[in-house]
From Swiss-Prot:
Coiled-coil positions: none
Domain notes: Consists of 3 domains; the N-terminus binds the ribosome, the middle domain has PPIase activity, while the C-terminus has intrinsic chaperone activity on its own.
Any GO BP annotation: 'de novo' cotranslational protein folding
Keyword Cell cycle: yes
Family of this protein: Belongs to the FKBP-type PPIase family. Tig subfamily.
Name of this chain's protein: Trigger factor
The reaction(s) this protein catalyses: [protein]-peptidylproline (omega=180) = [protein]-peptidylproline (omega=0)
Gene3D superfamilies cross-referenced by the UniProt entry: 3.10.50.40, Trigger factor ribosome-binding domain, Trigger factor, C-terminal domain
Segments forming domain PPIase FKBP-type: 162-247
UniProt-listed Pfam families: FKBP_C, Trigger_C, Trigger_N
GO cellular component: cytoplasm
GO molecular function (one): ribosome binding
EC code: 5.2.1.8
């Protein structure tokens, strides 16, 4: 057997292997001989089928099996004796070996892990948002809960924020209707942000029974390419306006949220405690993402294996059920690159950089932090002790929690050398920033 490995562009390498024809033909002959005792062919006694008949019937498939086995065996053997560590199965191209008397020759293209060097850790400049929970924030949260349990009553009032509207509409672009631009008995809450800003503004001040036409500007990043950045014309008929009737914050309302006492002070305390937990969780997440963004900015040229990038995009596409939505393979792959390539590359780069930092620093898990986080998680459930017991008995959940804490310990170490400044934000602003973080 002869072999050679050639470096290609980026992280790719090409392994070329040639196995003599005699070795392949001998393996095929042995494969056919092994079939003889088990064959049942009309006109021949079991185990007595002539070799030339076996070869006529099974020669091609036997050769295919041998080629597959030899390619797999030789590839594994050569790679195991080399210094290469492929990141994914190779792409195989069979050059020769299809015919009897022909040597098996194939090429295997594979990628290796890139060299990882983390730069710029002493020059990280990060701005973090900060907020203190106020009584006003608690009041606004209670109002949000009231709106979630609101009733709606049909009214002859003019449409305003908070009202539930029922309407028919049709949109046109350059005088032509477009897909998704038509609705009948469409219902939504005005001011909720469910529709584009121009669409909601166009309905403000209308009364049931009125018709109105208005322009709607689509944003540049709108998912539909034929609408992105363009202005469409909409004609709307408002069929019904329903005014929002908020419930009183009374004993029955409070008990509906699990506060057994029905007491307003207990209710506010529970709301504040939950908001405090959510605020701290959001601040931790933002702190994490800002650090990762800063590290990636300093290491933007970190190369990633194409195989890993493709695998991550495929995984993300599966999460979005893209195969079922777009059966056409070519179109799906094009959309997959448009939607996921940037985030997939970011995830892989980050994984390589963080993996390197973990290897270098060998951080030991702080079990007191694990226990503290477990207490915090358990406190959000009706039976905290049962939750803690479940984490202690479920190995995977415990490992996942420890992985989060270990990452936070690394983050704390990296922040020790970073230049950090803070900007005052409201609770709502921090929650909005947190909501924009992907994955």
């Amino acid at each position: 057997m002869e072999s050679s490995i050639e470096k290609l562009e980026g992280l790719a390498h090409k392994l070329t292997v040639e196995i003599p024809a005699g070795d392949i033909d001998q393996a095929v002959t042995q494969r056919l001989k092994s079939l003889r005792p088990r064959l049942r062919i009309d006109g021949f006694r079991p185990g007595k089928v002539p070799p030339h008949i076996i070869k006529q019937r099974y020669g091609i498939s036997a050769r295919q099996d041998v080629l597959g086995d030899e390619i797999d065996r030789s590839y594994r053997e050569i790679i195991s004796k080399s210094d290469y560590a492929p990141v994914a199965p190779p792409q195989i191209e069979l050059i020769s070996g299809f015919k009897e008397g022909e040597a098996l020759k194939f090429e295997a293209i594979f990628e290796v892990m890139p060299e990882v060097v983390v730069n710029g850790l002493d020059a990280l400049d990060i701005t973090l948002p900060d907020a203190q929970l106020s009584d006003k924030d608690v009041d606004e949260m209670i109002d949000t809960l009231r709106r979630q349990r609101a009733n709606f009553v049909e009214s002859d009032k003019i449409a305003g924020n908070g009202d539930r509207l029922t309407l028919d509409f049709i949109g046109t672009l350059n005088g032509e209707p477009f897909e998704g631009g038509k609705g009948e008995d469409f219902c939504f809450n005005l001011g909720s942000g469910q529709m584009l800003p121009d669409f909601e503004r166009g309905l403000q001040g209308m009364k049931a029974g009125e018709e109105k036409s208005f322009d709607v500007q689509f944003p540049e990043d709108y998912p539909s390419e034929n609408l992105a950045g363009k202005t469409a014309q909409f004609a709307a008929t408002l069929k019904k306006v329903e005014a929002m009737i908020l419930p009183e914050v009374d004993e029955s309302f409070i008990k509906a949220f699990g506060i057994a006492s029905g007491d307003a002070a207990d209710f506010r305390r529970a709301i504040r405690d939950n908001m405090s937990r959510e605020l701290e969780k959001a601040k931790r997440r933002i702190k994490r993402e800002r650090l990762f963004d800063a590290i990636l900015e300093k290491n933007a040229d970190q190369i990633v294996p194409n195989a890993s990038l493709h695998q991550e995009m495929e995984r993300m596409a599966k999460e979005f059920n893209l195969e079922k939505q777009i059966p056409d393979t070519e179109k799906r792959h094009q959309l997959m690159h448009q939607l996921f390539e940037k985030n997939a590359k970011r995830r892989i780069q980050l994984g390589l950089l963080l993996g390197k930092l973990f290897d270098e620093r060998q951080i030991e898990i702080d079990q007191s932090r694990v226990q503290e986080r477990l207490e915090s998680i358990a406190a959000t459930y009706e039976d905290p002790e049962e939750v803690k017991k479940w984490y202690q008995n479920d190995e995977k959940s415990r490992r996942d929690l420890e992985a989060v804490i270990l990452e936070e310990q690394l983050i704390d170490q990296l922040y020790e050398k970073a230049k950090v400044s803070y900007e005052t934000r409201s609770f709502q602003e921090i929650m909005a920033v947190n909501a924009q973080i992907h994955g």
